[in-house]
């Protein structure tokens, strides 16, 4: 079976990660103690993608929980599903990274990383045919960004041919936690560009907008935001966990979605969007789902897809629906909005269908877009980075941990290169002028 090892690092990663486990445990009929209490064979058919069968009828997540301070771990452990995880898989330090990327990547994190890798290795060895890894983390803090990227590169060394996926929460200007977020994020992106196969960019600002505008929540909490993220994560991983008419796995996803190795930053979306309190009971149709899916308001990254073009996109539909109708609607969208899709990748929209809808919904759709508009997000971070870096503000926190200014300059130019690559492909046309641009690749 194609197993996935899940890693969650830092405060944000652990909060999103534990929410994700709540959602998928619920979908698979696993109760908080790991007992199977479900009612359908389909729940167990591919349960071993994410769970180890520990004893008769007891399932344990293939999850590794990492943090440089015990606080968040304690709240996960005392949370609703805290007893689900293997106690040995909680790996934490005592010192904290203090929102400092250098601490997570070079000093504090580097001391803890071997302990984490031991646990990862143990999880990987208990698999039959490991498909890859997924990491949940944020890019604005110290642990998730610094130590998260360190873990990625270490795992990459040891398992070079396995897929590496990340769900990365990108800092946003409106919802800021720390002043050094642009530094941490830029240093992280510098790593992600080289070391991951796909990165789902989740953006607090976009999540807040969805909560305000669509879900009509007046004061969204992080709980509400994480609920949205977990819905998306559950959608992206559906095909791996349930049988369906058209299945995908992490590698197929990467093959279909990544036209050039560096351009693997995706915008996720979800439909229908409903608030936690009223997950609606009105019937939704396939055309509505498809429409909503591609709607800018439903994107979990604060970029407007109408400002760029889709290089590739994928939609994962869940629920009992007619394949024919799904295909028709997807074609319909592409024909109507053809200017938003690059013309030099024919049929660049992939569809997958899984028969089992999420809890409380008749059908849902998860959208994954590789759009050149994601450059807005990197531009935004880059501008903030440059503003501070020009004055060398806050740099001493990083150089004090042994970092060199050179590394900042490199990260900055790598991110700017990424932005111009997106721009280049946005403007490229299918005719021969574009062909020359590719020869230079």
Swiss-Prot record:
The keyword Methyltransferase does not apply. Expressed primarily in touch receptor neurons. Disruption phenotype: Defective touch receptor neuron synaptic transmission with reduced levels of rab-3 at synapses, conferring touch insensitivity. Irregular touch receptor neuron shape. The heterozygous mutant, but not the null mutant, rescues the touch sensitivity defect in the mec-15 single mutant. Signal peptide: none annotated. InterPro entries: Beta-tubulin_BS, Beta_tubulin, Tub_FtsZ_C, Tubulin, Tubulin/FtsZ-like_C, Tubulin/FtsZ_2-layer-sand-dom, Tubulin/FtsZ_GTPase_sf, Tubulin_C. GO terms for cellular component: cytoplasm; microtubule; neuron projection; neuronal cell body. Its cofactor is Mg(2+). Mg(2+) binds at residue 69. It comes from the Eukaryota. GO terms for biological process: cytoplasmic microtubule organization; detection of mechanical stimulus involved in sensory perception; detection of mechanical stimulus involved in sensory perception of touch; mechanosensory behavior; microtubule cytoskeleton organization; mitotic cell cycle; positive regulation of detection of mechanical stimulus involved in sensory perception of touch; positive regulation of mechanosensory behavior. GO terms for molecular function: GTP binding; GTPase activity; metal ion binding; structural constituent of cytoskeleton. It is found in: Cytoplasm, Cytoskeleton. Keywords: Cytoplasm, Cytoskeleton, GTP-binding, Magnesium, Metal-binding, Microtubule, Nucleotide-binding. GTP binds at residues 11, 69, 138, 142-144, 204, 226. TTubulin is the major constituent of microtubules, a cylinder consisting of laterally associated linear protofilaments composed of alpha- and beta-tubulin heterodimers. Microtubules grow by the addition of GTP-tubulin dimers to the microtubule end, where a stabilizing cap forms. Below the cap, tubulin dimers are in GDP-bound state, owing to GTPase activity of alpha-tubulin. Plays a role in mechanosensory transduction (touch sensitivity). Dimer of alpha and beta chains. A typical microtubule is a hollow water-filled tube with an outer diameter of 25 nm and an inner diameter of 15 nM. Alpha-beta heterodimers associate head-to-tail to form protofilaments running lengthwise along the microtubule wall with the beta-tubulin subunit facing the microtubule plus end conferring a structural polarity. Microtubules usually have 13 protofilaments but different protofilament numbers can be found in some organisms and specialized cells. Belongs to the tubulin family. This is Tubulin beta-1 chain. It comes from Caenorhabditis elegans.
């Amino acid at each position: 079976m194609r197993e996935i090892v899940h890693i969650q690092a830092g405060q944000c990663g652990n909060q999103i990660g534990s929410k994700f486990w709540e959602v998928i445990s619920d979908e698979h009929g696993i109760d908080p103690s790991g007992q199977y209490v479900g009612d359908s064979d389909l729940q167990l058919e591919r349960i071993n993608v994410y769970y180890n069968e520990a004893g008769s009828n007891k399932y344990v997540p293939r999850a590794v929980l990492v943090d440089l301070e015990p606080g968040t771990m304690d709240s996960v452990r005392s949370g609703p599903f805290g007893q689900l995880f293997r106690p040995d898989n909680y790996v934490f330090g005592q010192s904290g990274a203090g929102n400092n990327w250098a601490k997570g990547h070079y000093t504090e994190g580097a001391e803890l990383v071997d302990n984490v890798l031991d646990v990862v290795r143990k999880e990987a060895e208990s698999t039959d045919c490991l498909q890859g890894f997924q990491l949940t983390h944020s890019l604005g803090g110290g642990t998730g960004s610094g130590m998260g990227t360190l873990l990625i590169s270490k795992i990459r060394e040891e398992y070079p041919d396995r897929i590496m996926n990340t769900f990365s929460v990108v800092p946003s200007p409106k919802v800021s936690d720390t002043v050094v977020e642009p530094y941490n994020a830029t240093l992280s992106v510098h790593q992600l560009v080289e070391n991951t196969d796909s990165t789902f960019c989740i953006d607090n600002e976009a999540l807040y907008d969805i909560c305000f505008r669509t879900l009509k929540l007046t004061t969204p909490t992080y709980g509400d935001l994480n609920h949205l993220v977990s819905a998306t994560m559950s959608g992206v991983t559906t095909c791996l966990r349930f049988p369906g008419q058209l299945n995908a796995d992490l590698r197929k996803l990467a093959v279909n979605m990544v036209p050039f190795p560096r351009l693997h930053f995706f915008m996720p979306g979800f439909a229908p969007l409903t608030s936690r309190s009223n997950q609606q009971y009105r019937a939704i149709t396939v055309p509505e789902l498809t429409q909503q899916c591609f709607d800018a308001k439903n994107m979990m990254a604060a970029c407007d897809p109408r400002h760029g073009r889709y290089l590739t996109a994928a939609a994962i539909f869940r629920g009992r629906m007619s394949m024919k109708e799904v295909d028709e609607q997807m074609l319909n969208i592409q024909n109507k909005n053809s200017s938003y899709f690059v013309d030099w990748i024919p049929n660049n929209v992939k569809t997958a269908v899984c028969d089992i809808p999420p809890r409380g919904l008749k059908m849902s759709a998860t959208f994954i877009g590789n759009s050149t508009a994601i450059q807005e997000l990197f531009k935004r971070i880059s501008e903030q980075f440059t503003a501070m870096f020009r004055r060398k503000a806050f740099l001493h926190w990083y150089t004090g941990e042994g970092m060199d200014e050179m590394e900042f300059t490199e990260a900055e130019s790598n991110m700017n290169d990424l932005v111009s690559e997106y721009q280049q492909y946005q403007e490229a046309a299918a005719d021969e002028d574009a062909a020359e641009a590719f020869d230079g690749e």
